[in-house]
Each structure stands twice: as structure tokens, then as C-alpha cells.
């Protein structure tokens, strides 16, 4: 568990939490026996707001290896997600000029539900998903997926092995990232290759990145 005393973004000293919910077990981990309940681990859940940049953030972070290596939620179980990503793929094809054989990279790609829509449009796809159990499902379904966390090192390896990327998706992931600077350094590993668009949620928004081209 990581105890944060500095803001993740601006590195200013964090004040005391404005909200402290005490010790909490991990979400999406229902237990089936009394013995399991007695041995269940709990972690602090407290939130501070940086007085310099205003970012609200957790003071304590459960190790990513413990949270995300074996994950429960699967994207394909949600009809709303399936409808959304189908529209998203078509929108990006039109807006960014994506076409056959372009390579689309998705960070935290889950079981490949979104990337399959790009495959249907004739594009090549690559997923980066830390949950080994879910990455295995994606690969079984024909969606090329790397079972790793996305960071500068992973991105550098992928840029060297796969070359030009035409679009990068990151949906519902940035808020889960502890080291946001390392994550963004990873995005920038592709800037010489790609038209980049970072997407967030059902309401699609774009983060402007200092890249040579942007769709």
C-alpha cells in the first residue's frame, strides 16, 4: 500500500483528508464463507484535495498488482458499453480518417470489446490490459492483447515492436492510474507515429497533446 504525502500532479504537499471513510475491503470481491470474511483485508479510504492545483485524490493506494492482475468486470457484459464502442469506432474512423490496416491501441482494453469494433472496420488492433485473466479472454477471441500495465517502459517496447500507431484509446482508466506522469510519458512514446486522441467515458472528450498531428 502506498501512502501519498504529495500531489500526484504538481507534487505539492497534501493536506489532511477532507473525507475519511476508514478501512474498506476491495470492491467486486464478494466472499462466500464466514472464514473468508474474517480474513478479508481492508485498506484506508481517504481523500485529500491539493491546495495548489485543486486535484482531489486518494491518500492511500492499494498496490496495482493486487487490484488489477485478476479482475472481475468484463466489458462485454454491458449492452450500453457494446452500443457505445460501436458508435465510437465509427466516429473515430470518420473523424480521424482511420482506415484498413491502421493500428489502434487501447490502454486497459479489458476483454477487447471496443477493439473488436475496430477489427470489424478492417483495422489492426493491440490491447494493453493488466488483468491476466481478462487479457487471456481477449486473446482467445482474436484480439491481440498484452497482459501488462501501461507505462513509459511498456509503451517504449510496443513502439519499437509495432511501430506507427494511428489512434490510442484510454477509456475509464486515467482516474485509476497512480503515477499519472509515467502514464503520460507512455502516451508520448507514440507521438512521432500517431494521430492521438485520448477518450474518457461515454461522453467522449479529447485531451490536447503536444503531437505533430491530431485528429
Predicted segment positions?
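N-terminal juxtadomain amphipathic helix
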Residues: 1-80
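Short, glycine-/aromatic-enriched active-site segment of Class I SAM-dependent methyltransferases
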Residues: 29, 196-215
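Conserved class I S-adenosyl-L-methionine
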Residues: 100-110
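Conserved SAM-binding loop of SAM-dependent methyltransferases across substrates and taxa
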Residues: 111-122
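Conserved SAM-binding motif I beta-strand of class I
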Residues: 124-129
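Conserved SAM-binding strand-loop segment of SAM-dependent methyltransferases
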Residues: 142-155
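A conserved beta-strand element that flanks and buttresses the S-adenosyl-L-methionine
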Residues: 166-169
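A short glycine-rich, Lys/Arg-flanked "PGG" loop and its adjoining helix->strand segment in the class I
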Residues: 181-198
Amino acid at each position: 500500500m502506498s501512502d501519498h504525502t504529495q500531489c500526484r500532479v504538481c507534487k505539492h504537499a497534501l493536506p489532511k483528508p477532507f473525507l475519511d471513510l476508514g478501512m474498506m475491503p476491495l470492491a467486486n470481491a464478494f466472499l462466500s464463507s464466514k472464514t473468508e470474511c474474517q480474513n478479508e483485508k481492508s485498506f484506508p479510504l481517504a481523500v485529500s484535495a491539493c491546495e495548489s492545483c485543486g486535484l482531489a485524490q486518494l491518500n492511500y493506494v492499494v498496490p496495482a498488482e493486487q487490484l488489477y492482475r485478476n479482475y472481475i468486470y468484463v466489458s462485454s457484459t454491458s449492452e450500453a458499453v457494446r452500443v457505445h464502442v460501436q458508435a465510437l469506432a465509427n466516429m473515430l474512423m470518420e473523424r480521424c480518417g482511420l482506415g484498413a490496416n491502421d493500428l489502434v491501441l487501447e490502454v486497459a482494453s479489458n476483454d477487447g470489446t471496443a477493439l473488436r469494433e475496430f477489427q470489424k472496420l478492417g483495422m489492426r488492433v493491440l490491447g494493453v490490459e493488466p488483468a491476466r485473466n481478462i487479457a487471456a479472454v481477449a486473446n482467445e477471441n482474436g484480439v491481440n492483447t498484452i497482459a501488462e500495465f501501461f507505462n513509459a517502459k511498456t509503451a517504449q517496447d510496443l513502439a519499437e515492436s509495432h511501430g506507427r500507431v494511428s489512434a490510442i484509446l484510454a477509456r475509464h482508466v486515467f482516474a485509476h492510474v497512480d503515477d499519472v506522469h509515467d502514464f503520460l510519458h507512455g502516451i508520448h512514446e507514440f507521438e512521432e507515429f500517431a494521430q492521438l486522441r485520448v477518450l474518457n467515458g461515454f461522453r467522449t472528450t479529447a485531451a490536447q497533446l503536444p503531437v505533430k498531428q491530431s485528429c
